[in-house]
Protein backbone atom coordinates (compact mmCIF):
# COMPACT_ATOMS: atom_id res chain seq x y z
CA UNK A 1 0.00 0.00 0.00
CA UNK A 2 2.89 2.35 0.69
CA UNK A 3 3.97 2.05 -2.94
CA UNK A 4 0.54 3.13 -4.15
CA UNK A 5 0.42 6.02 -1.70
CA UNK A 6 3.83 7.25 -2.89
CA UNK A 7 2.60 7.68 -6.48
CA UNK A 8 -0.98 8.68 -5.60
CA UNK A 9 -0.97 10.20 -2.10
CA UNK A 10 -4.49 11.57 -2.35
CA UNK A 11 -7.16 9.61 -4.15
CA UNK A 12 -10.73 10.84 -4.71
CA UNK A 13 -12.15 7.52 -3.49
CA UNK A 14 -11.71 5.14 -0.59
CA UNK A 15 -9.52 2.07 -0.95
CA UNK A 16 -10.09 -1.03 1.11
CA UNK A 17 -7.10 -3.33 1.09
CA UNK A 18 -5.89 -6.49 2.76
CA UNK A 19 -2.19 -7.24 2.91
CA UNK A 20 -1.51 -10.81 1.89
CA UNK A 21 0.53 -12.65 4.50
CA UNK A 22 0.26 -16.28 3.39
CA UNK A 23 1.44 -18.37 0.42
CA UNK A 24 -2.23 -18.57 -0.58
CA UNK A 25 -5.13 -16.51 0.65
CA UNK A 26 -8.83 -16.51 -0.28
CA UNK A 27 -11.29 -13.66 -0.07
CA UNK A 28 -15.01 -13.49 -0.71
CA UNK A 29 -16.78 -10.39 -1.87
CA UNK A 30 -20.46 -9.96 -2.61
CA UNK A 31 -20.36 -11.21 -6.17
CA UNK A 32 -17.03 -13.02 -6.56
CA UNK A 33 -14.22 -14.94 -4.89
CA UNK A 34 -10.57 -13.96 -5.12
CA UNK A 35 -7.64 -16.28 -4.53
CA UNK A 36 -4.14 -14.84 -4.23
CA UNK A 37 -1.21 -17.24 -4.58
CA UNK A 38 2.49 -16.58 -4.28
CA UNK A 39 4.58 -16.89 -7.44
CA UNK A 40 8.36 -16.95 -7.96
CA UNK A 41 9.91 -13.53 -8.55
CA UNK A 42 12.80 -11.55 -7.09
CA UNK A 43 10.38 -9.58 -4.88
CA UNK A 44 7.09 -10.78 -3.36
CA UNK A 45 4.54 -11.24 -6.16
CA UNK A 46 1.18 -12.93 -6.39
CA UNK A 47 -1.01 -14.43 -9.05
CA UNK A 48 -4.76 -14.12 -8.77
CA UNK A 49 -7.74 -16.30 -9.53
CA UNK A 50 -11.12 -14.62 -9.71
CA UNK A 51 -14.27 -16.74 -9.75
CA UNK A 52 -17.75 -15.39 -10.31
CA UNK A 53 -20.40 -17.93 -9.31
CA UNK A 54 -23.51 -18.25 -11.47
CA UNK A 55 -26.94 -19.18 -10.27
CA UNK A 56 -29.12 -21.67 -12.08
CA UNK A 57 -31.39 -20.80 -14.97
CA UNK A 58 -34.82 -19.40 -14.25
CA UNK A 59 -37.58 -21.77 -15.37
CA UNK A 60 -40.48 -19.87 -16.87
CA UNK A 61 -42.38 -23.14 -17.11
CA UNK A 62 -42.01 -23.89 -13.39
CA UNK A 63 -42.97 -20.31 -12.50
CA UNK A 64 -46.14 -20.52 -14.58
CA UNK A 65 -47.02 -23.97 -13.19
CA UNK A 66 -46.67 -22.59 -9.65
CA UNK A 67 -48.88 -19.61 -10.53
CA UNK A 68 -46.18 -17.08 -9.73
CA UNK A 69 -47.01 -13.62 -11.13
CA UNK A 70 -44.51 -12.19 -13.64
CA UNK A 71 -44.01 -9.18 -11.34
CA UNK A 72 -42.26 -11.52 -8.84
CA UNK A 73 -39.90 -13.21 -11.29
CA UNK A 74 -37.04 -10.72 -11.18
CA UNK A 75 -36.70 -10.84 -7.40
CA UNK A 76 -36.82 -14.65 -7.43
CA UNK A 77 -34.05 -14.69 -10.08
CA UNK A 78 -31.93 -12.58 -7.72
CA UNK A 79 -32.33 -15.02 -4.85
CA UNK A 80 -35.08 -13.25 -2.91
CA UNK A 81 -38.15 -14.92 -1.47
CA UNK A 82 -41.32 -13.04 -2.42
CA UNK A 83 -44.60 -12.82 -0.53
CA UNK A 84 -47.54 -12.03 -2.79
CA UNK A 85 -51.21 -12.01 -1.83
CA UNK A 86 -50.66 -14.39 1.06
CA UNK A 87 -48.42 -16.83 -0.87
CA UNK A 88 -44.69 -17.23 -0.34
CA UNK A 89 -42.58 -17.93 -3.41
CA UNK A 90 -38.95 -18.97 -3.02
CA UNK A 91 -36.11 -19.10 -5.56
CA UNK A 92 -35.81 -22.89 -5.28
CA UNK A 93 -39.29 -23.14 -6.80
CA UNK A 94 -38.14 -21.67 -10.11
CA UNK A 95 -34.33 -21.81 -10.30
CA UNK A 96 -32.32 -24.69 -11.73
CA UNK A 97 -29.04 -26.03 -10.37
CA UNK A 98 -26.18 -23.55 -10.08
CA UNK A 99 -24.21 -23.28 -13.31
CA UNK A 100 -20.46 -23.41 -13.69
CA UNK A 101 -18.98 -20.07 -12.65
CA UNK A 102 -16.75 -17.81 -14.71
CA UNK A 103 -13.07 -17.88 -13.76
CA UNK A 104 -9.96 -15.92 -14.68
CA UNK A 105 -6.33 -16.39 -13.60
CA UNK A 106 -3.93 -13.44 -13.91
CA UNK A 107 -0.26 -14.14 -13.39
CA UNK A 108 2.84 -12.08 -14.27
CA UNK A 109 6.31 -11.43 -12.89
CA UNK A 110 7.20 -15.04 -12.21
CA UNK A 111 9.09 -18.10 -13.30
CA UNK A 112 6.87 -21.02 -14.29
CA UNK A 113 5.88 -23.06 -11.23
CA UNK A 114 3.36 -25.93 -10.90
CA UNK A 115 1.04 -23.85 -8.71
CA UNK A 116 0.24 -21.59 -11.69
CA UNK A 117 -1.02 -24.46 -13.87
CA UNK A 118 -2.96 -25.86 -10.90
CA UNK A 119 -4.75 -22.54 -10.33
CA UNK A 120 -5.38 -22.03 -14.06
CA UNK A 121 -6.78 -25.55 -14.58
CA UNK A 122 -9.89 -25.34 -16.78
CA UNK A 123 -10.43 -21.60 -16.23
CA UNK A 124 -12.26 -19.51 -18.79
CA UNK A 125 -9.34 -17.12 -19.26
CA UNK A 126 -5.68 -17.49 -18.31
CA UNK A 127 -3.70 -14.23 -18.57
CA UNK A 128 -0.02 -15.05 -18.26
CA UNK A 129 3.24 -13.28 -18.88
CA UNK A 130 5.41 -14.22 -21.81
CA UNK A 131 8.25 -11.75 -21.32
CA UNK A 132 10.67 -13.22 -23.86
CA UNK A 133 9.76 -14.57 -27.28
CA UNK A 134 13.11 -16.00 -28.32
CA UNK A 135 14.54 -19.27 -27.02
CA UNK A 136 17.98 -17.69 -26.57
CA UNK A 137 16.48 -15.35 -23.93
CA UNK A 138 15.85 -18.21 -21.49
CA UNK A 139 18.87 -17.24 -19.40
CA UNK A 140 17.49 -13.68 -19.14
CA UNK A 141 14.10 -15.06 -18.12
CA UNK A 142 15.69 -17.15 -15.38
CA UNK A 143 17.93 -14.32 -14.21
CA UNK A 144 15.10 -11.76 -13.98
CA UNK A 145 12.47 -14.27 -12.76
CA UNK A 146 10.21 -14.06 -15.80
CA UNK A 147 8.98 -16.55 -18.41
CA UNK A 148 9.56 -17.12 -22.06
CA UNK A 149 6.50 -17.40 -24.27
CA UNK A 150 7.26 -21.09 -24.69
CA UNK A 151 7.29 -21.64 -20.92
CA UNK A 152 3.96 -19.81 -20.65
CA UNK A 153 2.54 -21.94 -23.46
CA UNK A 154 3.60 -25.11 -21.62
CA UNK A 155 1.73 -23.90 -18.52
CA UNK A 156 -1.26 -23.30 -20.78
CA UNK A 157 -1.06 -26.85 -22.14
CA UNK A 158 -1.01 -28.20 -18.59
CA UNK A 159 -3.86 -25.97 -17.42
CA UNK A 160 -6.12 -26.33 -20.47
CA UNK A 161 -7.92 -22.98 -20.10
CA UNK A 162 -10.71 -22.15 -22.53
CA UNK A 163 -8.67 -19.12 -23.64
CA UNK A 164 -5.15 -17.86 -22.90
CA UNK A 165 -3.63 -14.43 -23.37
CA UNK A 166 0.07 -13.68 -23.16
CA UNK A 167 1.05 -10.29 -21.81
CA UNK A 168 3.96 -8.44 -20.20
CA UNK A 169 6.30 -9.12 -23.11
CA UNK A 170 9.52 -7.35 -23.88
CA UNK A 171 10.18 -5.79 -27.29
CA UNK A 172 13.89 -6.70 -26.95
What are these regions (language model features)?
Residues 1-19, 53:
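Active-site HxH/HxHxD metal-binding segment of metal-dependent hydrolases
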Amino acid sequence: MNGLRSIAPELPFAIEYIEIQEEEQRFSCESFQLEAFKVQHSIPCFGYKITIPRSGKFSVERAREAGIPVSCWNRLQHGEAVEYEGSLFTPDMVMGEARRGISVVYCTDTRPIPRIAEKAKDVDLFICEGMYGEEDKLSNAKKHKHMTMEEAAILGLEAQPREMWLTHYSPS
